[in-house]
């Protein structure tokens, strides 16, 4: 079907998102579980954003990029989870035509931005480890700002094309989407006519946005690993690998789940698999990322304690413990 000669007909005013069909009591359980997951995601990522903003020791490109990535995670998870929570308590589970495509646009734009941000963070680690002497001269404030703007805007600009094309398909009958988000694949399946051009453009966008950033990250870390292996000191090697380990874990979680969704062959239950994989990279991964980034990072853990107001209490407890130990030692001597 030729796109230019196509007549757009929208008799469908809303869609039905089936989500996870189950007994009403299970729907309440799902609501509780995902409410907790969403709250923890917001708290964890907001804590990182505040830590980077308030702690001057974290005003370096690596942590500034991490703070922006955490803010991006908040936006990313907010495009889907609030509507999913509302559907757990709703009997109609409907979403308007405009809201559905708005969710599609923002969800995939933020997801695309995450891929680009992971590339930028890999590039920053490459410069810091492979070009340490030139790092301050290359990673200037202007370059860092430009990379941040690029990371936020690129997905929104590039995903306009597939969203507009899919929204212009004729929808004149079925309106039930067996998913918890407005995913483009079931949306195209609901169209009254098959448009191979739109499907090809969407598939091309997916391939470019998944494989391109992933290959860039692999190449960056291949060079990083070679540079680390040439380091003479074992302590330097451990520090370099520790710095990159958290970022690599996030890359594997995000790109691994996305590629399972869009690259791997279909299973016996493709629809259910799609839901679970989408749930993993849209809800579980943003929940785990704050823990991954702060688990082995002393500077981040110290800054997070300040944000949570626990550092002062920890210091007081340590001082009291030292005081009691010194008193006990003195009494034993006397």
Question: What name fits each language-model region?
Answer:
Residues 1-334:
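Transmembrane helical core of 7TM receptor-like proteins
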């Amino acid at each position: 079907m030729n796109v230019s000669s196509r007549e757009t007909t929208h008799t469908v005013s809303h869609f039905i998102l089936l989500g996870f069909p189950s007994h009403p009591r299970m729907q309440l359980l799902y609501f509780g579980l995902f409410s907790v997951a969403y709250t923890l995601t917001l708290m964890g990522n907001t804590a990182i954003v505040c830590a980077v903003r308030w702690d001057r020791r974290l005003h370096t490109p690596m942590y500034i990029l991490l703070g922006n990535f955490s803010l991006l995670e908040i936006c990313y998870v907010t495009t889907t989870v609030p509507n999913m929570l509302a559907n757990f308590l709703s009997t109609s589970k409907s979403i308007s035509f405009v809201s559905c495509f708005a969710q599609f646009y923002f969800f995939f734009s933020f997801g695309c931005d995450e891929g680009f941000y992971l590339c930028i963070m890999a590039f920053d680690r490459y410069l810091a480890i492979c070009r340490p002497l030139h790092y301050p001269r290359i990673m200037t404030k202007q370059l860092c700002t430009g990379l941040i703007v690029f990371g936020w805007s690129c997905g929104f600009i590039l995903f306009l094309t597939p969203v507009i094309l899919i929204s212009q398909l004729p929808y004149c009958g079925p309106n039930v989407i067996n998913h918890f988000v407005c995913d483009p694949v079931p949306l195209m399946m609901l169209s009254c006519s098959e448009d191979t051009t739109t499907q090809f453009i969407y598939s091309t966008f997916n391939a470019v946005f998944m494989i391109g950033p992933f290959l860039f990250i692999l190449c960056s870390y291949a060079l990083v690993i070679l540079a680390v292996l040439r380091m003479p000191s074992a302590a330097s090697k451990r520090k370099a690998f520790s710095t990159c380990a958290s970022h690599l874990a996030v890359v594997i979680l995000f790109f691994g789940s996305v590629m399972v969704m869009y690259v791997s062959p279909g299973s016996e239950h493709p629809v259910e698999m799609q839901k679970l994989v989408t749930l993993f990279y849209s809800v579980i991964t943003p929940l785990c990322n704050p823990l991954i980034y702060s688990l082995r990072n002393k500077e981040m853990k110290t800054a997070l304690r300040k944000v949570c107001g626990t550092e002062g209490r920890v210091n007081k407890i340590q001082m009291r413990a030292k005081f009691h130990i010194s008193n006990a030692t003195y009494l034993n001597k006397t």
